């Protein structure tokens, strides 16, 4: 016979703790399934019970939760509970209501603030008003007017890229991802810091920081769900971390470089004054703004630099490389594009301005299809309102509930897009392109998101795409041919906030003829 006095106080305490955990977990499960304000929203029960189901698909399996959401919507309908306190929508006509351009005061959930390790950057700012305050000086610098003024430099760097392809790589295989990565690094480096990294001068365009943004992205889910991991990594000596995780060496090098440039600009007032007329960079603009002192410290500006440069590199590189792939892989597209560019630029040495390029219908159609299939951000855009109720059909979403929609689904929805996974520039050539439901197609074209938090770099990215593709495919003495490259090198198989292809992919490789 067992006697309670035979058990030590330690065992009794452990038993009580275990019982408490079991009772608490059971009670919480019952509450979330039957009494929570979202209890009547359809969706997988495991998602309603715990956030660990998302962790399983994104951290353990690897960037798959977005695809599970798409799959579950086919079962549960257009509104679905995907977390204990999160709702996801899949209704293309609801997108503009959920992310209105004017009047929205939504905030970002704090949980995701440190997923990139730069939580004080504009992109991950939580509060609506705080976001608007930080955004103001930067938004002016990325306005259409500013980018058009800067477009001459974008053209100059693109000319360097094309010249290097022609003179140094004929008969060789190059990776378009690496070439456009180098191009973007030289452009954004000068725009942000007032210097060029000369990435285009490296043999084969294999610059030191190539693919660093993809390496950073692969840590995003760990950073989102376990932010303390970054705290530990930052506290450990780099030499030990790089031995365990070799890709981290490139990330550390990239972060040090960004930090040194911010320190140079911030501390060297003489440099700032000297270059203000030559090229006033985005960080000069921030540091000379009327922001509070706490917004101008080195740590926050460093976070802004990481966010800005990282976003520009990954999205521009992927979209342009994907465009090159489909131009070369889709019958008739290259011929149509070259014919239009030749007619518009009889003398290939006389480049067109960005507005003139934007007026070319086929080039514009190619760029739109590239943006649609590249999907700059593959993850849902989470928001919440502390005060507002969201109403969708007969469902009411209470304040402080996280909600969102995916670009991934919006840009590939078979209810909107004819043959959504195919590259079809022709869909944009009608005088008024229409969706399958009869609505204007542009209503559903959201590669840069919409609302107060839409992508700041839209004009920058569009200028680079127009200039890059027009300059490259106007050259009648350069012929590109895909080399051991197919759909696996562009198709998205994982969501790490940005879309990633299979790990084995070597990118879009082309033979220069």
Curated annotation (Swiss-Prot):
Residues carrying covalently attached carbohydrate according to the record: 211, 351
Coiled-coil intervals, chain numbering: none
Top EC class for this record: oxidoreductase
Residues that, per the record, bind heme: 455
Subcellular location: Membrane
Swiss-Prot/TrEMBL GO biological process terms: mycotoxin biosynthetic process
Entries under InterPro entries matching the protein: Cyt_P450, Cyt_P450_CS, Cyt_P450_E_grp-I, Cyt_P450_sf, Cytochrome_P450_monoxygenase
Sample GO molecular function, one term: iron ion binding
Stimuli inducing this protein: Coexpressed with the other cluster genes on brefeldin A production optimized medium.
Biochemical pathway: Mycotoxin biosynthesis
Cofactors named for this entry: heme
Record membrane topology: Single-pass membrane protein
Keyword Heme tagged: yes
PANTHER family recorded: CYTOCHROME P450, P450, PUTATIVE (EUROFUNG)-RELATED
Function in brief: Cytochrome P450 monooxygenase; part of the gene cluster that mediates the biosynthesis of brefeldin A (BFA), a protein transport inhibitor that shows antiviral, antifungal, and antitumor properties. The proposed biosynthesis of BFA involves formation of an acyclic polyketide chain that is differentially tailored throughout the backbone.
Name assigned to this protein: Cytochrome P450 monooxygenase orf3
Organism annotation: Eupenicillium brefeldianum
Native organism taxonomy: Eukaryota, Fungi, Dikarya, Ascomycota, Pezizomycotina
């Amino acid at each position: 016979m067992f006697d309670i006095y035979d058990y030590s106080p330690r065992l009794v305490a452990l038993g009580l703790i275990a019982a408490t955990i079991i009772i608490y977990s059971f009670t919480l499960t019952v509450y979330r399934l039957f009494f929570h304000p979202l209890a009547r929203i359809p969706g997988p029960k495991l998602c309603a019970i715990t956030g660990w189901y998302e962790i399983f698909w994104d951290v353990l399996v690897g960037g798959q939760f977005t695809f599970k959401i798409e799959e579950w919507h086919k079962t549960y309908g257009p509104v679905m509970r995907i977390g204990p306190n999160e709702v996801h929508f899949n209704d293309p006509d609801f997108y503009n209501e959920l992310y209105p351009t004017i009047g929205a005061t939504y905030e970002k959930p704090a949980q995701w603030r440190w997923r990139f390790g730069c939580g004080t950057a504009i992109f991950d700012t939580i509060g609506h008003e705080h976001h608007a305050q930080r955004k103001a000086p930067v938004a002016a610098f990325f306005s259409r007017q500013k980018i058009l003024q800067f477009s001459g430099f974008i053209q100059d760097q693109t000319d360097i890229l094309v010249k290097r392809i022609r003179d140094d790589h004929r008969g060789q295989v190059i990776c378009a991802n690496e070439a456009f990565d180098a191009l973007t690094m030289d452009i954004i480096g000068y725009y942000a810091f007032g210097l060029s990294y000369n990435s285009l001068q490296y043999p084969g365009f294999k610059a030191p920081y190539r693919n660093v943004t993809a390496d950073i992205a692969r840590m995003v889910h760990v950073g989102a769900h376990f932010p303390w991991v970054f705290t530990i990594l930052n506290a450990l000596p780099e030499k030990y971390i790089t031995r365990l995780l070799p890709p981290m060496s490139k990330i550390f090098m990239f972060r040090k470089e960004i930090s040194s440039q911010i320190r140079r600009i911030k501390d060297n007032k003489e440099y700032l004054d000297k270059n203000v007329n030559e090229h006033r960079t985005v960080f000069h603009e921030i540091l000379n703004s009327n922001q509070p002192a706490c917004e101008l410290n080195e740590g926050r500006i460093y976070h802004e630099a990481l966010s800005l440069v990282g976003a520009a590199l990954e999205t521009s590189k992927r979209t342009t490389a994907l465009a090159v792939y489909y131009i070369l892989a889709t019958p008739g597209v290259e011929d149509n594009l070259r014919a239009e560019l030749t007619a518009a630029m009889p003398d290939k040495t006389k480049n067109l301005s960005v507005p003139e390029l934007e007026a070319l219908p086929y080039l514009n159609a190619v760029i739109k299809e590239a943006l649609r299939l590249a999907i700059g951000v593959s993850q849902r855009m989470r928001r919440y309102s502390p005060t507002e109720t969201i109403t969708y059909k007969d469902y009411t979403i209470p304040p402080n509930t996280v909600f969102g929609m995916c670009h991934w689904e919006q840009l590939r929805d078979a209810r909107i897009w004819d043959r959504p996974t195919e590259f079809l520039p022709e869909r944009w050539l009608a005088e008024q392109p229409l969706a399958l439901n009869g609505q204007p197609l542009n209503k559903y074209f959201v590669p840069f998101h919409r609302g107060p938090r839409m992508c700041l770099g839209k004009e920058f990215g569009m200028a680079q795409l127009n200039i890059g593709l027009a300059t490259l495919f106007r050259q009648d003495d350069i012929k590109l041919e895909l080399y051991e490259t197919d759909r696996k090198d562009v198709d998205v198989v994982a969501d790490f906030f940005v879309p990633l292809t299979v790990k084995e992919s070597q990118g879009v490789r082309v033979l220069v003829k």
